[in-house]
Amino acid sequence: MSLKQSFPLLETRGLLIVFEGCDKTGKSTQCKLLFEELKQKNIEVRMINFPNRTTQTGKLIDQYLKGKIYLSDEDIHILFSKNRWEIIDTIKTNILNGITVIIDRYSYSGIAFSVAKGLDFQWCKQTENGLLKPDIIIYLTGQTKNMASRNGYGSEIYERIEIQDKVKKCYEKMIEIPLWNKINADQDVLIIKKQIETIIQKFSLENNKLEYI
């Protein structure tokens, strides 16, 4: 069965597919691979990365992540959330027009990283209430020490093993089946790609109504 055949309601609306996981788990790589696969299947698709570093909030976030400016944990959490809210209408319009949207990091990253720093879970979650709920979440997870050995690790302030371990625990507490699909990120890139395609092929959109977090 082709990917296009597995999306029976794509003529009605697109899907919202979110990739989550700790840093250096291969999210961006798999987002790009899925994006190209869907394009080859003649499925209209867009790809978005959060934080979106091109906006005003995104530029501040970029400076913060690189250690160039200081912001309180509460302030940076709100800034990350605002960064998502800025383009949610565009995402919604795309989906309603039959375009599938792939997102590299979403609300769950914002919650996990903030809770890992000691903020209250419910407080962190409330800033996300009202954003679109994904149809599929691909959660890539693996051994933190393996992630730390990958190129570029440590270039941003959260890329520390002790922080990533806490983030991983927060992610594990948020997992809801069948929305979340957990994949071992320590595997070969192409094996992971195939597993993701299988998840999407098996997905059944029960109705075309959008749901919200």
Curated annotation (Swiss-Prot):
Keywords: ATP-binding, Kinase, Nucleotide biosynthesis, Nucleotide-binding, Transferase. The keyword Cytoplasm does not apply. Pathway: Pyrimidine metabolism; dTTP biosynthesis. The lineage of its organism: Viruses, Varidnaviria, Bamfordvirae, Nucleocytoviricota, Megaviricetes. This is Putative thymidylate kinase 251L. Gene3D superfamilies: P-loop containing nucleotide triphosphate hydrolases. PANTHER family: THYMIDYLATE KINASE. InterPro entries: P-loop_NTPase (IPR027417), Thymidylate_kin-like_dom (IPR039430), Thymidylate_kin_CS (IPR018095), Thymidylate_kinase (IPR018094). Catalyzes the conversion of dTMP to dTDP. It comes from Invertebrate iridescent virus 6.
